[in-house]
C-alpha cells in the first residue's frame, strides 16, 4: 500500500534534524540530484532585491570565495560542509573562484563561514 502525501509529511515532521539530513543525502544519491543546488538557485533572486535595502542597514551578507589558495582540497571540504554540495559541485565552485559560496546570511553566520574557509586556506570576502 502506498503512503499518502499527508502520511509522508507527518513522518518527516517527526524526524530529528540529523535524520532529515541523512534522508536528504540518501534521496540525493538515489535520484542523482543535489538539493543544495536548487536552494542556491532559489536564494539568488532573493539576494538581488537586497541591493535596494543596502542603503539602510545591511542585514543579509554574501560569502564570496576569492581564491582557493594552496590547500584546495581543504577548501573543497569546507565548501561542502557549508553548502551541502556534492563533491563535483563544490570542486567546480572552488575552481571557478571568485564565486559566492553562500548568500543572504545573517552577519554572524557569514563571519563564521568566512572563518571556516579562511582556516582551510581560502581567501574570502563578505559582502
From Swiss-Prot:
Source organism, top-level taxon: Bacteria
Stored Gene3D superfamilies: 3.30.1390.10, Single helix bin (1.20.5.710)
MF term (GO), any: mRNA binding
GO cellular component, one term: cytosolic large ribosomal subunit
Cystine residue pairs: none
Keywords assigned by UniProt, alphabetized: Ribonucleoprotein, Ribosomal protein
Pfam families, sorted: Ribosomal_L12, Ribosomal_L12_N
InterPro entries assigned: Ribosomal_bL12, Ribosomal_bL12_C, Ribosomal_bL12_C/ClpS-like, Ribosomal_bL12_oligo, Ribosomal_bL12_oligo_N_sf
Any Gene Ontology biological process: translation
Keyword Ribosomal protein recorded: yes
Signal peptide: none
Family affiliation: Belongs to the bacterial ribosomal protein bL12 family.
Function noted in UniProt: Forms part of the ribosomal stalk which helps the ribosome interact with GTP-bound translation factors. Is thus essential for accurate translation.
Matches recorded under NCBIfam families: L12 (TIGR00855)
Record note on quaternary structure: Homodimer. Part of the ribosomal stalk of the 50S ribosomal subunit. Forms a multimeric L10(L12)X complex, where L10 forms an elongated spine to which 2 to 4 L12 dimers bind in a sequential fashion. Binds GTP-bound translation factors.
PANTHER family per UniProt: 39S RIBOSOMAL PROTEIN L12, LARGE RIBOSOMAL SUBUNIT PROTEIN BL12M
Protein's name according to its UniProt entry: Large ribosomal subunit protein bL12
Species annotation: Bordetella pertussis (strain Tohama I / ATCC BAA-589 / NCTC 13251)
Gene encoding the protein: rplL
Amino acid at each position: 500500500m502506498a503512503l499518502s502525501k499527508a502520511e509522508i509529511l507527518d513522518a518527516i515532521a517527526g524526524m530529528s534534524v540529523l535524520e532529515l539530513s541523512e534522508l536528504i543525502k540518501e534521496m540525493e544519491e538515489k535520484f542523482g540530484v543535489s538539493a543544495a543546488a536548487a536552494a542556491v538557485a532559489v536564494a539568488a533572486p532573493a539576494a538581488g532585491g537586497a541591493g535596494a535595502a543596502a542603503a539602510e542597514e545591511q542585514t543579509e551578507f554574501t560569502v564570496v570565495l576569492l581564491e582557493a589558495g594552496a590547500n584546495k582540497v581543504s577548501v573543497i571540504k569546507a565548501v561542502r560542509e557549508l553548502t551541502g554540495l556534492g563533491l563535483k559541485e563544490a570542486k567546480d565552485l572552488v575552481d571557478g573562484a571568485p564565486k559566492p559560496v553562500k548568500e543572504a546570511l545573517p552577519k554572524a553566520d557569514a563571519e563564521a563561514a568566512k572563518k571556516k574557509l579562511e582556516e582551510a586556506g581560502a581567501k574570502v570576502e563578505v559582502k
